[in-house]
Swiss-Prot record:
The cysteine framework is XIV (C-C-C-C). Residues 62-74 have a biased composition (Basic and acidic residues). It comes from Conus villepinii (Villepin's cone). Belongs to the conotoxin R superfamily. This is Conotoxin vil14.5. GO terms for molecular function: potassium channel regulator activity; toxin activity. Keywords: Cleavage on pair of basic residues, Disulfide bond, Ion channel impairing toxin, Neurotoxin, Potassium channel impairing toxin, Secreted, Signal, Toxin. Residues 23-85 form a propeptide.
Length: 112
């Protein structure tokens, strides 16, 4: 989200600059630029976005957050420590001897 705000600020400031570069001979390299409706709309949108952010409201452009449902395994919590250790060892054995060829750290990450 911070990157989008930074991009909007850069776009608004560069489009709001009062001068553009001109390479016509005999003229000043800078001439006044016209402020377009698009630049004004962008500045207005940025102002609203920053005002909402200051108020603590989520901006309209942001996607609603999707929460994943928690996957709970009650049978694992009810197992004894020795039984859990056996399951981890068995998982490690099948992971390391499998056809896929996982490394030890990959298997350890998946099994624990």
């Amino acid at each position: 989200m911070g990157f989008r705000v930074l991009v909007l600020v850069v776009m608004a400031t560069t489009s709001a600059l009062p001068f553009t570069f001109s390479e016509e001979p005999g003229r000043s390299p800078f001439r006044p630029a016209l402020r377009s409706e698009e630049a004004q709309a962008l500045r207005h949108g940025l102002t609203l976005l920053l005002a909402r952010r200051a108020d603590g409201q989520p901006p309209d452009m942001r996607q609603p957050e999707m929460r994943r449902p928690e996957v709970r395994q009650p049978e694992f919590a009810e197992l004894s420590v020795g039984q859990r250790r056996w399951d981890v060892d068995q998982c490690m054995y099948y992971c390391l001897t499998g056809v896929v060829g996982y490394s030890y750290t990959e298997c350890q990450t998946m099994c624990t």
